């Protein structure tokens, strides 16, 4: 009988393989199950917000979420983290949000700078029909907030605020964009008149686009004097979520460790999301760079970004909060205290 059973048992090598596969599968299953339980735990903490009554014409609370691709990778990294870990908690709290996606160094900065500039000069970004509709509706009594994922997005947002307060740079940028739009219209007219030169015109257009892109990049890193500071309550409270993204073959052991510990990331992100939903643990902008501003994330970035010749003039690697004028400029900005959220998890 034993000989018969033994004949059906796998050999030594197959047993090792099956044991290895079973161990890996079990670790993944346990981690994903714990991750889902953690997210559900945080959803249950904010679900009562969805049950609160609202006035007939009252708008729900709205957040603005900036999704920006991390250095060396695509926008999908930020998008997947938000969809998997953060969005379920906001949905459970019945919080409305608007996502703004961008990728590439400087793109988010331009969007924020334009929004800040328009707000300072009372330039409305809302169409007339929307204005008429909003005049009838009541704004939410709960405060809005801004959600940023990653150290790179935080840097671009703050530099965007800085450039939005620099009227000279913004006026120059707007004039450049207007000139580019006029040139584009002229080229389209020429292409319509002369079909034979389509290929040459398209090549010229590509070259002009490259040149204009470089000109915009150089204007983004141009030094501008800081005067005064951001007025209190000018910006909504900022929520800073970590976006760990380690690349490279040499970092495989560390990447595998993170892969099997997604539950820890869910715990960290969930605690911050609950603070945002409940509007608690709000603090002033720190006077020095550190953990609260995700300074440790820069060690995960590809080394190629730190070996560039214009290292100190690029947005992601430029000196940050090292000038007293810069610290004073941002000191009226409110942010959610992510370090307090980490402490509350274990209490």
UniProtKB/Swiss-Prot annotation:
The regions listed as transmembrane in this protein's record are 13-30
Cysteine pairings via disulfide bonds: none
GO terms, biological process = protein insertion into mitochondrial inner membrane
One GO cellular component term, please give it. cytoplasm
Kindly state which keywords UniProt assigns to this record, in alphabetical order.
Membrane, Mitochondrion, Mitochondrion inner membrane, Protein transport, Translocation, Transmembrane, Transmembrane helix, Transport
Q: Where is this region: Disordered?
A: 181-216
- Membrane topology, record value: Single-pass membrane protein
Q: Which residues lie on this side of the membrane: Mitochondrial matrix?
A: 1-12
InterPro entries per the UniProt record, alphabetical: Mt_import_IM_translocase_Tim54
Report the subcellular localization: Mitochondrion inner membrane
What ranges does the Mitochondrial intermembrane topological domain annotation cover?
31-347
Where in the sequence does UniProt note compositional bias of the Basic and acidic residues kind? 181-196, 202-216
Assembly, per entry: Component of the TIM22 complex, whose core is composed of TIM22 and TIM54, associated with the 70 kDa heterohexamer composed of TIM9 and TIM10 (or TIM8 and TIM13).
Q: Which family does it belong to?
A: Belongs to the TIM54 family.
Q: Tell me, what does this protein do in biology?
A: Essential component of the TIM22 complex, a complex that mediates the import and insertion of multi-pass transmembrane proteins into the mitochondrial inner membrane. The TIM22 complex forms a twin-pore translocase that uses the membrane potential as external driving force.
The protein's name: Mitochondrial import inner membrane translocase subunit tim54
Organism field = Schizosaccharomyces pombe (strain 972 / ATCC 24843)
Q: What is the lineage of its organism?
A: Eukaryota, Fungi, Dikarya, Ascomycota, Taphrinomycotina
| Gene name linked to the record | tim54
């Amino acid at each position: 009988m034993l000989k018969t059973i033994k004949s059906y048992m796998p050999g030594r090598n197959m047993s090792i393989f099956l044991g290895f596969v079973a161990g890996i599968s079990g670790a993944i299953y346990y981690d994903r199950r714990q991750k889902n339980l953690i997210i559900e735990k945080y959803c249950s903490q904010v679900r009562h917000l969805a049950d609160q009554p609202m006035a007939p014409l009252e708008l729900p609370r709205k957040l603005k979420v900036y999704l920006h691709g991390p250095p060396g990778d695509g926008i999908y990294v930020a998008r997947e983290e938000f969809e998997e870990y953060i969005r379920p908690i906001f949905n459970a709290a019945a919080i409305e949000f608007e996502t703004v996606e961008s990728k590439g160094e400087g793109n988010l900065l331009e969007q924020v700078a334009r929004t800040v500039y328009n707000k300072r000069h009372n330039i409305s970004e809302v169409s007339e029909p929307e204005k008429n509709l909003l005049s009838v509706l009541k704004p939410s009594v709960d405060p809005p907030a801004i959600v940023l994922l990653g150290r790179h997005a935080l840097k671009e947002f703050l530099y965007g605020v800085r450039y939005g307060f620099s009227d000279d740079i913004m006026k120059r940028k707007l004039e450049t964009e207007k000139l580019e739009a006029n040139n584009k219209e002229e080229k389209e007219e020429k292409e319509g008149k002369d079909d034979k030169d389509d290929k040459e015109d398209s090549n010229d257009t590509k070259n002009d686009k490259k040149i204009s892109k470089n000109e915009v990049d150089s204007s983004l890193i141009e030094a501008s004097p800081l005067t005064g500071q951001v007025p209190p309550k000018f910006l909504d409270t900022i929520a800073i979520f970590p976006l760990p993204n380690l690349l490279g073959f040499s970092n495989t052991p560390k990447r595998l460790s993170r892969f099997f510990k997604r539950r820890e990331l869910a715990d960290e992100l969930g605690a911050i999301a609950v603070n945002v939903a409940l509007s608690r643990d709000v603090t002033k902008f720190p006077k020095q760079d550190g953990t609260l501003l995700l300074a440790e994330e820069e060690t995960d970035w590809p080394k190629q970004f730190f070996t560039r010749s214009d290292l100190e003039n690029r947005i992601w690697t430029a000196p940050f909060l090292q000038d007293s004028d810069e610290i004073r400029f941002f000191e009226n900005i409110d942010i959610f205290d992510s370090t307090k959220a980490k402490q509350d998890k274990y209490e």
